[in-house]
Every structure is written in structure tokens, then in C-alpha cells.
Amino acid sequence: MTTYLVPCGLSILNWMRAYSSGDPNKRYANIDPAAVEDLLDEQEQWRSNEKRELNVWKSTVLEKARAADVEHWDPRVSAETSTLRARRPGGPLITDEDRIVLLASDTDEGISAALCVAAVVAAGNPGRIDGIAEPEDELPPGKATVVRIDGLKPTSLSLGRACEAMGTVLHNALATGPSERIEVHLTGGYKAALLHMLAMTEVAYSRFPSRVSAHYIFEGDGRSATGHDKAVRIGLRRFPRGQLIRMREELSYAKRGLPMRGTPMFEGLAWEKYGDRTRLTDFGRGYLAVLGGTWTPGTNDGGGL
């Protein structure tokens, strides 16, 4: 079983708009532009509805996706499907042995884009689309799940909440089983968050180096994704186990505002002094989530370390 964590941006919506308007550079397949335009219109109507129920989306937007022959769309329609196809050059993008988790920004357009990516990943099959989940929710196998990342939006003053949410998703993915692999794909998504996601992936990799990997593909090289653009594996740094234990302890003290024990190792990197108090940086909030959350002194809660 492999869990694919894929930060999701707006590239698929941008492609659909360009394709439906007749942009010759976006003609990756013989699809009726009018059908793509109908799909866009249906997605916009669903997005403007206050309830935005998933069952309604499946019965309206997904039906339009099938009418637009989404099953045969070239993976280049989005950064997310391009990177998945590069890692899965043959067969369907998702099987019973996979979990595909699309990390969506905290905006209506971000959710819309992620659901459209899910439609392509699932080849229009509603049974392969789990729905819109919270970071702490269980990740079902054999399905594409959209996770809305709280605070991941242009109006946010920091990425602290978003890092904590993404770290929680990573922690839950690690908890799925001792033999299950986790691939983090960093080709698409909200650019400001990719660096934070990479840093958190290094903490996850430090915990389970045989299970965790990160990948990306170069954009705009002009080759067909159906010809299998090469997915490049990112070399990840690794913290020794003792440093991970110390990191969780130190960040827990900083979050609670308690005096540090011993010489600080992660001041400036994951926490900082703020007047006479301490607070976690955005990176620190993500690190602590990956490590299992706040550690309580005097307990044997190891967070799986």
C-alpha cells in the first residue's frame, strides 16, 4: 500500500479555462472544448452554492466530467496528475492498493480544483472519490481524498495553522501501517507552502527512512506525460532519533511556555523568544504535528519515536 500526499494548486482549472477558450497549446487530447466549458460552468455553480454537498457534486459536476471524457484526459492537464503519472507510468492512477491525498488550499477555488483533480485520478468513477476530509480524519484505501488545509490561503498572515494541518496529515499517513510507503509529491500546490511541506517530510523521513520519499518533475519541458516525464527523487536530510526526541520535547516546552531543560537545539529553527515568552515558528508547528503533538512531561508518550 502506498499513500501519495499531493499538494494541490489551481493548474487544472487554468488548463480547463485555456482549453475551452481554444488555446492550441493546451490541446493534449481530442476533447470537445464545449464539454470542458460545461464542466467548468457546472463546477462554478456547485462552488457558488452555500452547502456545497459532495453528493450533489458527484451527481452534477462529476457527470459533466464523464461527459467530457475525463477518463482519457492527458495527465498534463494538471501538475498533480502529471507527477502521479510519472510515478505510475502504466495502468490507472489509483488502485485498491493506493491512497491519494490531495492537499487543497483553504479557498473555494482550491477545493474546486482538488475535486477536479480527483475526478481525473478516479477516471470519473464516483466510488474512487472519498470526499472532503479534515487533516485528522482516517485515510481510506483505494480512494482519492481531498483534505482542506486550514489557513492555507492568500489572506493568512502566517502559515502556522497550515503547517500544523499538513503535519497532522503526514503523521496520520505514517500511522497507517508499518510496511506502508508514503510518497510526497512537490510539483504542484501553493508555492509558499512547498518549502514547509518539504521540511516536514524530512522529519517524517527521519522517523521512517525506508517508508518515506519525496518527488517532483520539471515543469514545461514539452514532453508528453503519457510518455512518462521522469519523476526526480529529492534527497532528504535525516535527524538522528535522539534529536527527534529532543525536538519534540523542546517544542512542547516552547509551546507551553515552560523553561527549557538543558541547552536549546532548535531555537530559531522551530521556536523563538517573543518578549518574555516562547512561541513556535511555522516550521515548528508542522514539526510538532509530524512528531505526534505536544509531549507531556512525566509521561511515556513517545509519539511513535
Protein language model annotation of sequence segments:
Residues 185-187:
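A short helix-loop-helix "switch/interaction" segment in the helical subdomain of ASCE P-loop NTPases
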